[in-house]
Amino acid sequence: DFIKSEIGHRTNVIAVGNSGNFVTMACSNSPELFNRIILVNPDSILTCAQTPGRYTKFYKEFLDLPIIGTLLYHIAVSKKSLRKFAKEYAFYNPHLIKKSYIDTCYENAHLGLSPKSIYASVHCNYTNCNIITSLKKIDNSIYLIGGSDLYLEEELLKEYLSYNSAIEYTLIHETKYYPHMEKPNEFLSTVFLFLS
């Protein structure tokens, strides 16, 4: 709807992480609205296909409790937890992690009417969707960009190729989950190369 009402023509889209699932599904439903799609470190196809199980449903109910759930949420999105996530998983070079980045993540985790509900839905697989059929159906150009130092990232990107051989991918060396923040110039040149 946003592309139809605001942009008004075919557009290129860049999506990071699990937001790529929504872009893939939207492109499958309305391919005429999309030109090229760039997915940065998309979730594995197996992760996309996971649905809420018994444990995750219990965890979601637990997080929805007013006092205990809110306490767990605040622990999960504390500055200490965000810093640990950034150092261990998100960034190749921990010296690139700016205090402003952690502050922004922390602030965004507390904005809105119910950020705890979004957190619970994402972590308990309620926002996942199986994209295999969509990947097979899409005829638009799809490019994948990954951080070379994420565990098994190249294998994950090759998994996408097994469902649509027209997909292309590249890895940006010495980056992890946020190559656009760790090596912005290299990321931009890669994007311009894909879009030209």
Go through each PLM region and give its residues.
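Conserved acidic catalytic loop of the alpha/beta-hydrolase fold
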Residues: 1-11
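Short glycine-enriched nucleophile-adjacent loop
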Residues: 20-31, 37
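Catalytic nucleophile serine of serine hydrolases
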Residues: 17-18, 41
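Post-His helix in hydrolase/transferase enzymes
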Residues: 181-193
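Conserved loop-alpha-helix segment in the C-terminal half of the alpha/beta-hydrolase fold
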Residues: 139-175, 181
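Conserved alpha/beta-hydrolase catalytic His-Asp/Glu region
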Residues: 48-51, 74-134
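Flexible "cap/lid" loop of the alpha/beta hydrolase fold
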Residues: 28, 37-69
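Residue in the alpha/beta-hydrolase core beta-strand immediately N-terminal to the catalytic nucleophile
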Residues: 12-14, 36-38
